């Protein structure tokens, strides 16, 4: 899991994920490196597949949904693994051919369009929260001004 979630630990940077994937693939070439990418999309210049992750998945109601997508998720990475995931995440025999339902296409596309701006604004807000609460004496993670790998700000 890239994001710290509810744990008091630093989130994993894409660079760290790359080092882990490289080591895992060196020691176990057939091992599949899967990354839960929730809260991490668009925060750094690269995403985990660019540095060796075989498969990533995340939610479309968070970063990539631009805060307006009401439902959905995604998988990305090696095409054979994406196809296998699609066949397991939908009804048998449908695979990736099913597409979205509930007339969500417009909201999903608008969310993808808004996502870079929403993520950038969220990072600015999280940094402000870190600074204000640290000044008030609270422990925060990450600290204000720190490089971030996801949107999570713990206080």
Can you annotate each of these PLM segments?
Residues 1-120, 124, 130-133, 139-140:
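Conserved PLP-enzyme active-site core in the AAT-like
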Residues 145-153:
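Conserved glycine-rich beta-strand-loop-beta hairpin in the small C-terminal domain of fold type I
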């Amino acid at each position: 899991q890239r994001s710290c979630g509810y744990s008091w630990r630093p989130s994993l940077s894409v660079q760290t994920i790359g080092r882990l994937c490289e080591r895992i693939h060196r020691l176990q070439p057939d091992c599949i490196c899967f990354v839960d990418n929730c809260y991490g999309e668009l925060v750094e210049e690269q995403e985990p597949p660019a540095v060796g992750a075989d498969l990533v998945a995340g939610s479309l109601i968070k970063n990539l949904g631009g805060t307006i997508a009401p439902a959905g998720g995604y998988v990305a990475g090696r095409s054979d693994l994406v196809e296998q995931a699609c066949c397991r995440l939908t009804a048998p025999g449908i695979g990736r051919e099913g597409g979205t339902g509930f007339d969500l296409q417009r909201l999903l596309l608008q969310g993808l369009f808004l996502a870079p701006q929403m993520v950038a604004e969220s990072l600015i807000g999280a940094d402000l929260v870190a600074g204000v609460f640290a000044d008030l004496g609270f422990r925060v993670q990450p600290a204000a001004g720190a490089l971030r790998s996801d949107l999570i700000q713990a206080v």
